[in-house]
Amino acid sequence: MIIFRKSFFTFWLLLNSVLALVITQNRVDRGTLDLSVGDITINSGASWSIINNAISTLVGSLTVQPNAGLYITSTSPLLSLQVTLTSLLSTIQNNGIIAFNSSPSLTSSTYNLVGLSLVNTGEMYFSASGVLPSVMALTAASWSNSGLMAFYQNQRSSGVVSLGTPLGSITNNGQICLNNEVYQQTTSINGSGCFTANRDSTIYIANVLLPVSTSQNFYLADSQSSIIVQAILTPQVFNVYGFGNGNMVGVTLPLLGNILNPAYSYNPSTGILRLRNLLVYQDFNIGPGYNPSLFSIVTDNGAGLPSTILGSVSYSGPVPPRALPASCKIACKPVPTAPGTNPTEYTTTITTTNSAGKPLTETGVVDISTDSNGSWFSSTTIFPTSSSSSSSSSTVSSTAPSSSSTKPSSSSQPSSTPPPSSSSKASSTTPSSSSQSSSTTPSSSSKPSSTVPPTGSSQSSSTIPSSSTQPSSTAPSSLSSPSSSTTPSSSSQSSFSAQSSIGQTSSSTVSSSSSQPSSSQPSSSQSSSATTSSSSQFSSSAPPSSTQSSFTAESSNSQLSSTTPSSSTEASSTVPSSSSQLSSSVPLTNSVSLSSVSSSDNGSSSASSPSSSQSSIASTAESSSTFPSSSDQQSSSIQSPSSQESSVSSTPTSSLQSSTNTISSSQDSSSFSPTTSDNSSTNSASSLSTLSSSDTSVSNPSTSNVSSTDNTQSSVASATPTDSAISATSSDITTEFTTTWEVTNSDGSVSTESGIVSESGTSFTTITTFPPPTTSSDITTEFTTTWEVTNSDGSVSTESGIVSESGTSFTTITTFPPPTTSSDITTEFTTTWEVTNSDGSVSTESGIVSESGTSFTTITTFPPPTTSSDITTEFTTTWEVTNSDGSVSTESGIVSESGTSFTTITTFPPPTSSSVAADVTTEFTTTWEVTNSDGSVSTESGIVSESGTSFTTITTFELPVVCKRDDISCGPATSATNSDTAAQDPTSDATAIESEFTTTWTTTNSDGSVETNSGVVSQSGSSLTTITTFAPDATSEYTTSWTTTNSDGSVATNSGVVSQSGTSFTTITTFEPPVVCKRDDISCGPATSAMNSDTAAQQLTSGMTATETEFASTWVVTKSDGSVFTESGIVGQSGTSFTTLTTFAPTTSSGAVQTEYTSTWEVTNTDGSVSTKSGIIDQSGTYFTTLSTFAPTTISGAIETEFTSTWVATDTDGLVSTKSGIVSQSGTSIATLTIFPEPAGTVYPVTTLFTTEYVTTCPNGELSTATGVVVVSTDSKGIEQTVTSVVPSTVYTKETVTSIITHCIKNKCFESTTTLVSSVPCPTQVPGVFTSTDNGHGVPIASIDVTTGAATVSNTIKAQDSTGFTSAGNAITTAITATGAVTTSVGGQGSTDYSNAGNTIAAGSGSDSGSGSGSGSGSGSSSNTVGIVNPKVSSAASGITVAAASASAGQSWPYSSGGSGNGVLPSGANNVGSNQTPTVSGGNSNPSTVTGAAVGAGGVVSGSPSYSGNSLLISFVSSQSGAISSSTGVTIPIATENSGSKFSVGKSAFIAIILTTFIGFI
């Protein structure tokens, strides 16, 4: 077996070493992942981020080195985290960062790390949402923390934090932070660390028998934190910091004082706050400086705690100054952001084989982001390859749930290099080519560069290189420091690049110079030709919401090389060449383009472009191009043989002195306002002009003169949608056509996609990707449905979710979680959500959603706005409102939405009491199906009125108009609706649209009064028609309480029935205040009989005056149709008369359930006294309202009160337990009204005493054995503690005591009665040296009831030393071996013996004399032996001996005639029975002296013996009543058969010592 164990252990170690995983570089995994890889080690400098892996089971040890991290994260609200390490042989060693975070999740998470040991010197974070209770347990057997541990919840729940193995110990020398958490102590706590409770957290010391180090600190960091300590008889001192501002310190029992001590006390000199419950207390070292008058007793009823009524103390003042320990100064950091949880982009290279069988290498951008549910998906944009003539490009957009593992590449080649965060420096570059061998040298960069499109863009970017066929100088241009730019996911900018790198967020900057060539770029000297890289590629990608992009062109002319640093913080790029083709929505038809920009000292600059007649660039809503101006005089010219004159103005932006040059023409048309980024500013006037063009392609070279003004003027170009012109709107494309291309998927497969491509010159951009080919009737729809699923065990279950249907193909998009209970309430409400379109763009939709439990179903989707401007819509919704008193209520009404602005138009009145009996009419928006006359089914939406089970359609909404992209005549010919108004007159040349909305108006009645009405209004043009008028606010009545300021300035609280009509309140009835009586004031209170709390009304007793009372009740009502229903309300009773005051409205299924019940509470009166009141409470959800307060009733003069109490009860099976509940007291009569249920798994503490053996040496050398007391107790957790009492040896009196003994095991208790005897075993007092021997726990020996002082004993006894006394010259020796206990009236206190034991009366010596003839006389003192038997044993004694008298030879026993001094054999001694006196034969009873003839010469005895009258009476007691105890005073237990004997109790010293010793131990 030993060999097998060793082999198994060796095999286990070998298996873990083989399966070990070592993380050496940053790694990100998303989706399902199996962590059964053995030991996991994360090396320094590396991190492992696991995202949306629902179950993470660690099967081996976990080691995180310094500067390393392990992150397990959930970003989905529907996905929880289950992280476990359950191997008892595994360890956790953290020197870096461990972070488990599921705070976005709406479900419960579990972090359960067991293992052999846990050592933390770094930082550990555990976070959950708190919507449902979560498990956070770090229960390793060996547990040590010297770093930071932080536990977070978004809101507090009943879940607790558990640290260490229960009943074990933990060592904390670091910081443990709690946020909305409860830490429940289950171990002893060592070390000098700190527990910090913050944001409504509680530290709960649940077991003080497990000691807490006096150097451990507890810090209450905010006003809602608290600490609670178990209250038992073993107090400790707890160091508490930060006590004040309303936070709480408490114990687990109500705070009650006794005769000598108050419920709490504070010592200003020591800083100790003592909280007491009668005899038990706990001490808290809160420090000095507190004002005792600011303490108050409160109740800590936080979630996850045993709620103790009035068991805590709060301090209303600020925290006095006190230095915090070093461990409490360790900052409680927030949960760090895990790598990979933010959307990111990176470039990748894909090598495939084309149709010709040749390898094709493509480069693209991978965009990783999440949808609205937190699910990850990726989209890839492929860059097109370059071509010398015409080139085509494709933009591949693939969307799929991401479950990829991403690692950075160490290669310097263009490859897949995603970073660990949202930034990306690695990218790729498509170099340009030239047909001339002496052409320009392609520019180079220190890193591969590429264009990274902005995250979330609805359009992809493409790059088309151009080739230069013109000769140019060979001055190579290099870019030593590639510029980089990162577009965050929330922004929308365009990005233009020419062999540049985009990575971190920064603007592209190229230094500029004046007349001397001071550029950092190498340039050719004194060359009049343009210095270029052979060509420059540009890519543009702009989502519809883009606001700004910058474009920088750099001149490498020897005269001047300058660019103005760009101040834009948006995406920007650098063009390190002077030859370019621009694909910024500008048609450049010539594939050969060469432009040169020169700059001189006089500030003039010229650029020629033989490639296109369109040398001006339109500024669109998606992108704008920025040219630097290097002239000192801010003037430049661009030559182009065109008839148009364009002006360029420069507008400096922000403090970085970037000049934004925008080209505009002299034609005026419609204008638009440019948008700028948040960090740029325009300090000059701006004029708007329009650019139009009659031709976009000219075969002959043309020039255009462009002049630039100073920095005080700016013109922004806009385009009108004329023929072949450049448009400023995002939907006006230069050329669009449909094409097909191949896409390489992530799994390497090649698929064909089709879509709409935009062509601008030689630049192609994918606008739309079509879904897979379907028939003309295959329409993709999404709907909610239910289906059956066969589980792995063969069972069939039903699931529901959202399914996408395309033709005959169905795809499950979302599966709803099953309802948690059968009573889930279905509600409908209006909301807004995000949808990811097929092209990867994200749009926002609104509609009506049905919620049942945690399941959501989309009922109606509102049509999107038809124009680009904000459209005002109105819909019905529900929201929460915080009232002036801080309470939260729910309101419903009609809300107007304009863009992102919401305005409340109408607030619906709450349900009223008048609508109880009758059906309530409500109006709401819904969707239904209609079967048309041709049999087809269509869906309509509108406003429906519901009255009972009847529905009436009030308004039917117009169906949305769906237009194709190129159908410009589609849609209503209306102008845009102003987003700032609810309705607007249509333009004069447009057809008016009829719309319906809810509004409020005032009406003047015939009597001149003005009232306000609300309803649904139809608007057609400027004509308004009222369709529906809402009913006015109804009047409702309910019971409430309010405060009133009396004439003397005092504030009183009144209760009564209030009528509410709209926002108007009227008091109908004011309840009489309750009469407060003292307990003994029998004349106080109304002279009425007691009202039974279980009935709604009761007859008043005769002879009493009837008092009118009001209370809540429920009754049954029969309708006119014979149906029966139940109503509730407030009933007034006067004598035997009942009147219904108020009928409560019935509760609806969509709201909280309203209940009413009787309760008792405490009220602080104006004089500071606390009184108890009872009444009827109305509970709706978490809100409580006092409906009626009962007046104290009297029964024959006695006052009836109700209060909460705790008592001890013996159940029918003999079990003794402690119960709590509400007790009613009337005079001296007490009745139990309510018994609180006991918490599940309650274990009662047990205290049991056992005897132990002490041995002492008497002065005469004898050993005296006594029994001591061993106290064995168990706490509420069942943990046994054993303590042996110290027994003094100071008692030398003989007393007896009778005790009633109660012995409890768990919650079963037994009672018996016994008698104890104390006596002195040693004649003199000597110091005792004791040794104890535990009698064992097999049979309980003794215990003492703390309340009564009674002792419990059992039936085992040890031998006692004999005690010798002398009586009448005879020595009585008693046997010392016994199995039972006995006392006798003999002074010797002899103990009983076995049946063969006997007591001996020793014979004395004697002499004789006589004549020689054989006769004579003599005297002797020979003793007689009396046999003594156990009074409980009827058998005769044996072994009786008689010592022979000293006589002449020949004497023998038995004696013969003749001689004297012979011993006498007593008769009857062997048959002494109970209560019998032994007799001796020979004529005398019990002789002590024998005289007679002596033995003469020759040995003949002569003479007759005679007996003296000296006698010894020996009597025996048959009934035993106690036990013998030693001089130590410790009781020797008696036999079980003697239990029940009683006699008077003497207040002996030894009993006092026993009680003192036991209570001192407790």
From Swiss-Prot:
It holds the Pfam family Hyphal_reg_CWP. Induction: Expression is repressed by RIM101. GO terms for biological process: fungal-type cell wall organization. The keyword Protein transport does not apply. It is a lipid-anchor; GPI-anchor. The GPI-anchor is attached to the protein in the endoplasmic reticulum and serves to target the protein to the cell surface. There, the glucosamine-inositol phospholipid moiety is cleaved off and the GPI-modified mannoprotein is covalently attached via its lipidless GPI glycan remnant to the 1,6-beta-glucan of the outer cell wall layer. InterPro entries: Cell_wall_rpt (IPR031573), Hyphal-reg_cell_wall_N (IPR021031). Residues 1539-1562 form a propeptide. Residues 1407-1419 have a biased composition (Gly residues). The keyword Ribosomal protein does not apply. GO terms for cellular component: cell surface; extracellular region; fungal-type cell wall; side of membrane. Residues 1-20 form the signal peptide. GPI-anchored cell wall protein involved in cell wall organization, hyphal growth, as well as in host-fungal interaction and virulence. Belongs to the HYR1/IFF family. This is Cell wall protein RBR3. It comes from Candida albicans (strain SC5314 / ATCC MYA-2876).
